[in-house]
C-alpha cells in the first residue's frame, strides 16, 4: 500500500523537482495542479489541496465497509489526472477530477492520507491487512 507521494512514485513520471522518472507500476504521469484554480461554483481553490474531500469509489475490495463519497484527508500539489485509466479505483474533485486511488494486482495506492482520516482511514488499513490481492 502506497500513500501520497508513494502513489506518485508508482507512476511513470512526475513533474516534481523538474521531472522524475518513477517506477512505472502504473502507466501515466503526475502533473502539478494549476496555480489559479476555481471550484464548481467559481470559488478560488488553494494549492496545495489541503483538507477533507470526498472520494468517489470504483468497486474494489479495499473499499469494504467504507461508504462511497467518504471524506479523506489530502495534502498535495500534484495529481494523477487520467481518471479514465483502468487502474483508477477512486477519484476526487478539486477544480477538476483526479485519481485518489489506484490499484493493480496486489498494489493499492492512495493520494490521500489514511493515517489522518480517522475511522475510514483505519478501516482502509484493516482492509489492506485482510485483502488477498484479488479484485
Predicted region positions:
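Cysteine-nucleophile active-site neighborhood
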Residues: 1-49
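Amide-donor transfer/coupling interface in amidating biosynthetic enzymes
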Residues: 29-135
Amino acid at each position: 500500500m502506497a500513500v501520497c507521494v508513494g502513489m506518485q512514485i508508482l507512476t511513470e513520471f512526475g513533474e516534481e523537482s523538474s521531472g522524475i522518472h518513477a517506477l512505472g507500476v502504473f502507466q501515466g504521469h503526475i502533473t502539478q495542479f494549476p496555480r489559479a484554480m476555481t471550484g464548481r461554483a467559481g470559488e478560488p481553490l488553494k494549492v496545495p489541496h489541503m483538507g477533507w474531500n470526498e472520494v468517489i469509489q470504483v468497486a474494489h475490495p479495499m473499499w469494504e465497509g467504507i461508504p462511497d463519497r467518504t471524506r479523506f484527508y489530502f495534502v498535495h500539489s500534484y495529481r494523477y489526472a487520467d481518471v479514465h485509466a483502468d487502474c483508477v479505483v477512486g477519484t476526487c474533485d478539486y477544480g477538476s477530477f483526479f485519481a485518489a486511488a489506484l490499484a493493480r494486482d496486489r498494489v493499492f495506492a492512495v493520494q490521500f492520507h489514511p493515517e489522518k482520516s480517522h475511522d475510514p482511514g483505519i478501516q482502509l488499513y484493516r482492509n489492506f491487512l485482510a485483502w488477498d490481492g484479488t479484485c
